[in-house]
């Protein structure tokens, strides 16, 4: 059993698509004795963003005794693609993308195209605002997720990007604790959803880092 000292622990927030690093401020009151830092990554592929996250965590790891990760949506996927397992003490994933290959496959169906077309064109712009990339799909297939960090997952039953079956399979394979909010969306943004999120973090057992024990 270990006791953590004031300000030796960092809450690292990795936002999702369309998010901003400043969203980390929401979590500051939940961890009053921790430093809180939002990572403002500049790239949007797992190989580039993963490298950004790895470099940032590697530097932060020299400054803090423990890093606790909070990652939202694709931010969780990018974080798991970054090779940072050994530097993260605990992870909270909110609406995480845990099977990018399956999501891309679904988007290919939604766009009414085929893998052969995507391979031939390289990139296909869709009507729903996402660019499908053959290089991206190939990278995902060639680099399956490796993740060994103690992780808690919050999932909304009305999430349209990831199915409950997919997130449950991931949780079982990685011994992650899964909490499902009935009626919750992919984006936890309403007052009810935000309160549920905050209560979930409190119940997960790292409410404030000062002099807390963690087994």
Explain the meaning of each model-derived region.
Residues 82-83:
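Aromatic pocket-lining residues of Rossmann-like dinucleotide-binding sites
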Residues 21-28, 50, 163-168:
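Short, surface-exposed alpha-helical segments at coil->helix boundaries
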Residues 5-6, 60-65, 147, 204:
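Glycine-rich phosphate-binding loop signature in dinucleotide/nucleotide-binding domains
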Residues 12-17, 70, 94, 154:
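Short hydrophobic segments within beta-strands
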Residues 87-169, 173-180, 184-215:
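The alpha/beta-hydrolase serine catalytic core
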Residues 2-44:
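Short, surface-exposed "cap/lid" segments of acyl-processing enzymes
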Residues 23, 43-61:
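Alpha/beta-hydrolase active-site loop
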Residues 70-79:
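Gly/Ala-rich beta-loop-alpha elbow adjacent to hydrolase catalytic centers
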């Amino acid at each position: 059993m270990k006791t953590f000292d004031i300000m030796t622990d960092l809450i690292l927030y990795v936002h999702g698509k369309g998010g901003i690093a400043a969203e980390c401020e929401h979590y500051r009151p939940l961890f009053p004795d921790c430093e809180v830092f939002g990572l403002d990554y500049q790239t949007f592929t797992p190989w580039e963003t993963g490298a950004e996250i790895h470099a940032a965590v590697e530097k932060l790891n020299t400054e803090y005794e423990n890093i606790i990760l909070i990652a939202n949506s694709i931010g969780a996927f990018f974080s798991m693609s970054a090779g940072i397992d050994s530097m993260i003490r605990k992870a909270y994933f909110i609406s995480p993308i845990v099977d990018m290959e399956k999501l891309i496959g679904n988007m290919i169906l939604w766009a009414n195209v085929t893998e052969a077309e995507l391979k031939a064109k390289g990139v296909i712009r869709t009507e729903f605002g996402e660019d499908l990339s053959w290089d991206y799909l190939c990278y995902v297939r060639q680099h399956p997720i490796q993740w060994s960090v103690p992780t808690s997952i919050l999932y909304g039953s009305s999430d349209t990007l990831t199915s409950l079956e997919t997130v449950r399979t991931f949780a079982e394979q990685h011994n992650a604790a899964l909490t499902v909010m009935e009626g919750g969306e992919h984006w936890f943004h309403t007052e009810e959803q935000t309160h549920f999120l905050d209560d979930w973090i409190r119940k997960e057992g790292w409410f404030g880092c000062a002099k807390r024990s963690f087994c």
